[in-house]
Every structure is written in structure tokens, then in C-alpha cells.
């Protein structure tokens, strides 16, 4: 049993990856599933599509590896966070589609909670803000809108879960109704300080306690899968939400270690150790993966438009044919020629929180070329990430020593060099950038004794390339000041003549 199987259940596809003991990928399979948009702002998945696609990828990955379930030491699960499922305990059938994390239908419920003055209490207890993003209001909406659901919940006939819980229920044919701390901490119902479901928050949202799963550490022997699914029973040893799993897969085990995932947006997590830091900069505090008896926390922030700015260069401006071409175009000029690109197409997120901000390209001159604009677009990803990381260090009151990176845009050397220059710390790209799935595998391995400790995993983590800062701190501060000036311009109250 020299292998680990990781299930990576994402927003648009399900994946399964077989890792060997060295954390290398032996085989992988991926399957997309349909997205449903019944109304503007609504996003749903059919939970049965999620389950069938996930099971199919497990079988395909094992087949590709020419291995069976009996060759796997354990199974780890990582998942899109906050997405909410309610199902019948007797049949395992969902009573409604899964309401996805992007879905905004619960804004009215959130507005009511804010009007009741609950914002401060929610932030203190959960580390989160009242927002449709999190699971609690989605669960409330399903109970309000499905006939008889609230009565059935009171009778103990229904179960709620995030995607990890739903998959484990199916994998064990209803024997286990569980989740881990990292997923529980995204529900608005879990108190990150007591490590328990919070009775007051459940009352505020009118949620019956019988709906909720049991919460365990992320690395834990949860139980075994039913032998019929994969030909032999498999120990479920790891569960974690995708961003926390990536932090674990990057071996960011000590306070002050941070990772940034450069995808369509950017997700940054900073390990704050055994301290849940209350942010003064609009970031959220969340449970990180727990692999032993000690609780672990992280600060989290996100940039709305990261790699998406490159898609806009391709599809909106038609400046490039493929996203990968951006690096060559940006490298055709020595710098951005004074151009600053603020890609606030959907407002500005942390640490600015300005939903009305619009995008802008500032500092154009007669000598500006498409190369300068491409370079400024890439630089915008690093500027936003730097502003966010600076807010994190102010909150955590401790310095970040290096930034570990993953995600699609982390393949871009120009971006990572500029990121290191702005931050003044090394930026490190690992050999294995499938860090989300790797985190789930590591957790499962630690729970089952396949790995002895986090230290063994940390020794295994390897850098592929480290980018060291080459510009002076004065120059970096000057560049950040240019960025902040450009941001101030997009936030000016605009006069459109009405």
C-alpha cells in the first residue's frame, strides 16, 4: 500500500489523483459536470452529478494507474467550499439542487441578519462576514422554500452537508455524516473559538441541530468506504476545503507561512498558528487544516480579478491569441512605461472593499504600446496580491518570510519575479503545483500513519524555482505608491451628468 488517492471536487469538474509516497502524481482523471443558472445570480449543481462524476474519476484514475483500491493506503477529499446540499437520511436523495458558493440568492436573508445587528457577533464567533457566499443562509433558504423541509428537519429526517459531507455519505452508503473543521468554519454556524456548532447562531438562522454533521480534525480516520464502489474498502483519512487544503499541500505548517493561488482570482491564506486573528482590514479568519490535537487558523483574502485580466487581454482587447502569449508580449518592453492597469471590472475586494470601483488603465502616453499594457496587466495581479498581503501582515502582526505559489498563472515567471520585487521576500513555486489535491493526500497519509508527521511531509515539499527580489525597497515602495494613486483614481466619485 504505497499510494494515496485524492478526490478534488471542484466547481466545474471532479478530479481524482493517485499519488505515490514521494507526493508525485501517478495517475489522474477529470470529468466536468453541468452548471445550472435558473435565474440571474443563482448557481446550482445537481448533487447526483457531483457524486457520479467523482466516482467515475476515482475508477478511471485507479485504472490508469493499473492499481486497485487495495493498493491505496488511504483516501483524502478536498472540495469546493460553502456549496450546500440537503438530503433525505433514509434514501440519500437530495431534496433540492446544491446551492453553489457563487450563488447570491440569499442576499435578503443576509440583509435581515444585518438589520438585526448580528454582524459583529457573527464576525467574533465565526471569523466570517454575513454574506450569501457562506453556507448558513443557503441552508436557511432551502428550509424556507422546499415544502415540509423544516418539519422534516425537526423530525431528524434530513441531513445538511457541504460537498465533502455529501461525498462521504455516498461513499459509505449513509454510515457517516461528517465534516472537518476547515469546511465547518465556512458555514456561519460553527464557532471557531469553541470548535463547536454555535447554538445562538443556529437559532438566529432557524437551523435544527439534527441537520448538522459531526466535525472532526482534517486528518482523522473518519471510517471506510463501502467495498462495492471501488472493489475494496478504503480508509477515509483526510477532508479539507480546497484553499485550506492547498495551504497544507504547500507545507505551510508554521505561523507566518503563506500561499497564494493565482487562478481566475487569487486566494491568499496566511497561517496564524493557534490564534484566530480578528481582521481589521476586511479579511476573514478561518480554520486551517487540523492534523493533530492543536487547532490551527489562517487569515484569508481574495483578489477578484487575477488571471482573468489575461483572459480580458485575449477576448476583450484581442491583444493575444492564447493566454500563454502574455508573458512574451509583456517581456517585449523593459517596464510598463508608467502605465498602471487597475482591473476592477467587478469592484475592488480586500483590502479596499469598493463594489462601485470600475476598471482603468492609467498613465498612457503617445509612446505606450500593447506590450506596456500587457505588462501592466500582469503587474496588476502582483500589485493586488501585495496590497492584500500587506493587510494580512498588519492583522497578524508578524512578518511573512516567503510566499509559496500555485495555480495556473504561477507558471508565469515575469509575474512571480515582479511579485518578489514588490514584496521584498522570496516567492517560491513548488515542483508539484497540484497542491490542493496533494493537501488532501497528505492529510489522509498523516491520519493513517503512512506519513509519520507534518515534518516528514515538509521535508518532502520541494521548490522548483525561487524568485528573489532584485529591486531596492525604495523602488518597490515607489511602484506601490503609483498603484495606490491609480486605485484612488478609480474610486473617485464619478459624475455621469445626472
UniProtKB/Swiss-Prot annotation:
Residues the record lists as binding ADP: 11, 15, 264, 307, 408, 412
Keywords assigned: ATP-binding, Glycerol metabolism, Kinase, Nucleotide-binding, Transferase
Catalytic activity: glycerol + ATP = sn-glycerol 3-phosphate + ADP + H(+)
Residues the record lists as binding ATP: 11-13, 264, 307, 311, 408
Pathway membership, UniProt: Polyol metabolism; glycerol degradation via glycerol kinase pathway; sn-glycerol 3-phosphate from glycerol: step 1/1
GO biological process: glycerol catabolic process; glycerol metabolic process; glycerol-3-phosphate metabolic process
Annotated residues for binding of sn-glycerol 3-phosphate: 11, 81-82, 133, 242
Top-rank EC class of the record's enzyme: transferase
InterPro entries in alphabetical order: ATPase_NBD (IPR043129), Carb_kinase_FGGY (IPR000577), Carb_kinase_FGGY_CS (IPR018483), FGGY_C (IPR018485), FGGY_N (IPR018484), Glycerol_kin (IPR005999)
GO molecular function: ATP binding; glycerol kinase activity
Cellular component annotations (GO), alphabetically ordered: cytosol
Matches recorded under Pfam families: FGGY_C (PF02782), FGGY_N (PF00370)
Regulation affecting activity: Inhibited by fructose 1,6-bisphosphate (FBP).
EC number: 2.7.1.30
Binding of glycerol, residues: 81-82, 133, 242-243
Keyword Protease: no
Family: Belongs to the FGGY kinase family.
Primary role: Key enzyme in the regulation of glycerol uptake and metabolism. Catalyzes the phosphorylation of glycerol to yield sn-glycerol 3-phosphate.
Protein name listed in UniProt: Glycerol kinase
